[in-house]
From Swiss-Prot:
Entry keyword annotation includes Membrane: yes
Function (record text): Key component of the proton channel; it plays a direct role in the translocation of protons across the membrane.
Organism, as annotated: Marinomonas sp. (strain MWYL1)
Transmembrane regions: 45-65, 106-126, 160-179, 232-252, 253-273
GO biological process: proton motive force-driven plasma membrane ATP synthesis
Name assigned to this protein: ATP synthase subunit a
Length: 282
């Protein structure tokens, strides 16, 4: 675990802390060395690990699918081509069943969301001490510090900033397509004249406004909560004796694969449903 034997509490807190870069109270910029320093950096602090892993996985997704598209073959398809075709057909079928509007953007968007979120979720299967243990084994430091003293989270979807950022992007698309399809007057009317007519405009606005704002919040919290809980269980298992770790981690990892796929699917499907509702012109 480390040169100093940490307590269970400090071990858990360490593995739940992001690698944070921002401005210190004295005006200098740099990495936070503990949770308090990260909190003092305020709103504009950047979670470097979340940004790096999510961007890297995004490029991995693009590279894999581009590689499969360039080497497509009808005679002897490769394993990668079969996987890509399976993903495309699955997402395309889901969009056709759920989305009732006309748009060439929704299917590619749904595919991107599903694969990207799946890859980010899949990082939860990496052992919690893999990075510091590997760095220490090859004899290198991380950011100039002992590997076991560096904060780094592998799973972007256990960071509420990442899940909220994705859900807010979906929210922007919901508002954009609502206005594009229904017009500004139609969109405003949907918020103010339903479900109880013009005499109840304040109540309608409150009801519909809360419902609209709840969409990105629920999207973000559902994904974050499930993956954060899964990561926390892996960390708790890592505290246990070696033999018990294997007895618990393997079954939990197998079960967690279902959660990884399911949460990516739910995020994608809710996005399709919300955008389908935005395209409905009553």
């Amino acid at each position: 675990m480390g040169i100093e034997s940490p307590t269970a509490s400090s071990y858990i807190k360490h593995h739940l802390q992001n690698l944070t870069y921002g401005q210190h109270p004295d005006g200098t910029w740099g990495l936070a060395h503990d949770a308090k320093e990260a909190a003092d950096m305020g709103f504009w602090a950047i979670h470097v690990d979340t940004m790096a892993i999510s961007i890297a996985l995004g490029f991995l997704f693009l590279w894999l699918f581009r590689k499969a598209a360039k080497k497509i073959s009808a005679d002897t398809p490769s394993g990668l081509q079969n996987f890509v075709e399976l993903m495309v057909e699955f997402v395309d079928g889901s969009v056709k069943e759920t989305f009732h509007g006309k748009s060439k953007v929704i299917a590619p968007l749904a595919l991107t969301i599903f694969v990207w979120v799946f890859l980010m979720n899949f990082m939860d299967l990496i052992p919690v001490d893999f990075l510091p243990a590997t760095a220490q084994w090859i004899g290198v430091t991380l950011f100039g510090a002992d590997p076991h003293h560096v904060y780094f989270k592998f799973v972007p979807t256990t960071d509420i900033n990442a899940t909220l950022g994705m859900s807010l992007s979906v929210f922007v698309l919901i508002v954009f397509y609502s206005i594009k399809v229904k017009g500004i007057s139609g969109f405003v009317g949907e918020l103010t004249l339903q479900p109880f007519g013009k005499w109840m405009i304040p109540f309608n606005l409150l009801l519909e406004g809360v419902g609209l704002l709840a969409k990105p919040v629920s999207l973000a919290l559902r994904l974050f909560g499930n993956l954060y809980a899964g990561e926390l269980i892996f960390i708790l298992i890592a505290i246990l004796p070696w033999g018990v770790q294997w007895a618990l981690s393997v079954p939990w990892a197998i079960f967690h694969i279902l959660i990884i796929v399911l949460q990516a699917f739910i995020f994608m499907m809710l996005t399709i449903v919300y955008l389908s509702m935005a395209h409905e012109n009553h």
